[in-house]
Amino acid sequence: MKAPTVLAPEQQKDKWQELLAFWCWFPDLFLDACTPKDPETGQKIGIELDPSQRMFMRSMFRFERTYHCYSRGWGKTMVELLTNYTKCVLVPNTQIFLTSSTMKLAANLIKQKHAEVLRFYPFLEGEIEKASLRENGAYIIFKNGSRIDTLPNSQDAKGNRGNQICSEESALLTKAVFDDAIEPIVSEPYKNQRTQKRHPYIVNGLHFITTTYYVSTDAYRQNLNYAQEMIDLDGSAIFGASWRLPIAFGRGRREADVLKIKTRVSPLFWLTNYEERWIGGSSNSLVDTMTLIKSRTLENPEIESDGKNEYYMGVDVARSENDGNNQTSIVVVKTLRD
C-alpha cells in the first residue's frame, strides 16, 4: 500500500489558499462539504440547497450590490443567515450588519433562525465564540474575529462601520435614510489582516432582501438602477421570483395551500407578497408613496372639529363577495384655508 504524500508546510498553505478561494466563489459547496451524514446510511442530514438558493448565496459573495425580491415562503431569511454565517467563517474579521425596519425586527430575524441554522450545520457551533439573542438587539461573535450585528433602517444606524449590510424588507427603506445612514456603513474597504491594505478579492456588500411594493418608491428606482448596472457589468445583480419557484423545487407549502391564501387576502397584498409584482400606476409620480403613507399617521389626532377649518370625508364602500377584498375604506381630509 502506497503511503500518502505529505506536503511541506508551504505547499500545504498554498493548497489551503486555493481551497479557500474556491469556497469563497462557491459558498454553497462549502456547506455541502460540511453537511452532516447519517453514520449508518451515509445519507446527508438536513438541508439540500436547490439551484435558486445556491444562486442567492453565490451572488452575495461575488457582487457588491444585490437586490432580491422573493415571495413569502421562499425562505429568504434562512438562506440569508446561512450566507452570512458562511462568510464570517471563511473571511476572518468580517463585520456584517443585518438591518430591518426596527431593531426589534432585525434581532428577531436572527433569534428565530439561529437554532435552526446550528441544527442543520452543527459545525458552525464550534466556530462561534458568543451569541446574544435579545429582542432589543442581537449579535454573534465568531472565534476568528468576525461578527454579525443588528441595526434598524433609520438614522440610529449612523456612525457604524462594517463590510456587509443585509437589509430585510428594504422596500420600505427611503433614499434619504439609505444615503445618510446605511450606505456609509460599508464605505471602508475590507483590509488584509496582516498588511492592513485593501484586500483585492474580498468586496464590501450591500444586499437587499424583500417582497415587492409600490413603483413610486425609492426601492423600485433602486431596482432599476441595479438592473442597468447589471447590464453594464458594474457590480450589481437583481433577482426575483413568485411563490411558484419554491414549489417547483419541492420546498414550502403545496400549491393548493398557497392558492387558498389568495381567496383570503386583498389583490394588492397577493401581488406584492406572492406574485412579486411592483404595483402602482407610475414610477415617476409627483407624490412619493412612502411620503404619502407617512402622512397618514397624525402625531396629535383630532377627535372633534376645531370650528375654524373644513373637513371632508370620503368613503369607498366594499361591494366584493370575496372576504379578502370586502373592506370599506374611510378617509378624512382637513382643509386649511388661507
Predicted regions and their residues:
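Phosphate/NTP-binding elements of NTP-utilizing enzymes
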Residues: 2-315, 332-337
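Short acidic, Gly/Ser-rich segments with clustered Asp/Glu that frequently serve as metal-coordination loops
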Residues: 317-325
